[in-house]
C-alpha cells in the first residue's frame, strides 16, 4: 500500500481492496461508472466509506485500478495465446470470443471497457486513456491473429487485417449492448456465426 492507502504498483491489493475492485467492476459493467457511488460499495460490502477511501482515496483512483486490473487480465490471456503455435487461428479467435459469450449469458453484464466507452466524455482523463489503450491493443491482437490465419490458409479477408479486426471488435461489443437491451442471446450468437463464416475460406465452409 502507498502512504495514502491505495494499492501501489507491483504490490498485490489486500483482500478488502480486491473485494472493492470486484464489486466496482460489476457495478460499472451493469450500471455504469457514473451511476455507482462509494455508498453503493459501502452498502454491499458492509464497509465504512472511510475504509473504502483508505484503499482508494477517490472514485477516479478506484476506476483506474479497476480498468488496470481488467486490462492486465485480458493482456495476460492474449499473451498466452500468442505463444500457442499449435492451435488454429480459428481456435484462438474462439478463445477470444468466449468472454463475450459469458457476458451474454448474464442478464446485464457487458465488457468493462465497452461499458466505459459509452460514457467516455465524462470519464477522468486517466481512465479515458486506459480505455483507448484497451481498444487499440485488442485491434492489434485481432489483426495479428487474422494475418496469421491468412498466412496459414485458415482465413480469407475482404479487407486489410486491421480493418477486419476493428469490424470484429466493434461487432462483438455492439452485440453485447443489443443483447442486454433485448435479452436475446441470438443477438450475440448470430453475429459470431456470421463473422466466423465470413472469415472462413469458401472451399472449407
Where are these regions (language model features)?
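Short helix-capping/turn signature of helix-turn-helix
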Residues: 56, 116-123
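Helix-turn-helix
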Residues: 19, 23-61, 65
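Amphipathic alpha-helical packing segments from all-alpha helical-bundle domains
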Residues: 75, 90, 94, 106, ...
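Amphipathic C-terminal alpha-helical segment
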Residues: 34, 103, 148, 168-186, ...
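Hydrophobic alpha-helical connector segments
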Residues: 65, 69, 79-109, 161-168
Amino acid at each position: 500500500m502507498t502512504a495514502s492507502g491505495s494499492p501501489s504498483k507491483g504490490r498485490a491489493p489486500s483482500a478488502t481492496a480486491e473485494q472493492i475492485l470486484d464489486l466496482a467492476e460489476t457495478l460499472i459493467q451493469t450500471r455504469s461508472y457514473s451511476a455507482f457511488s462509494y455508498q453503493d460499495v459501502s452498502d454491499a460490502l458492509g464497509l465504512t466509506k472511510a475504509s473504502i477511501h483508505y484503499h482508494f482515496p477517490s472514485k477516479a483512483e478506484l476506476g483506474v485500478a479497476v480498468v488496470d486490473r481488467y486490462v492486465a487480465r485480458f493482456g495476460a490471456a492474449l499473451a498466452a495465446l500468442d505463444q500457442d503455435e499449435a492451435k488454429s487461428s480459428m481456435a484462438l479467435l474462439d478463445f477470444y470470443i468466449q468472454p463475450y459469450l459469458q457476458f451474454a449469458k448474464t442478464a446485464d453484464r457487458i465488457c468493462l471497457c465497452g461499458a466505459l466507452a459509452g460514457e467516455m466524455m465524462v470519464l477522468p482523463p486517466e481512465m479515458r486513456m486506459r480505455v483507448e489503450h484497451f481498444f487499440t491493443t485488442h485491434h492489434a491482437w485481432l489483426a495479428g491473429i487474422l494475418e496469421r490465419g491468412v498466412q496459414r490458409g485458415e482465413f480469407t479477408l475482404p479487407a486489410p487485417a486491421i480493418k477486419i479486426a476493428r469490424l470484429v471488435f466493434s461487432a462483438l461489443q455492439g452485440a453485447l449492448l443489443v443483447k442486454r437491451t433485448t435479452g436475446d442471446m441470438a443477438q450475440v450468437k448470430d453475429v459470431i456465426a456470421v463473422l466466423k463464416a465470413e472469415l472462413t475460406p469458401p472451399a472449407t465452409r
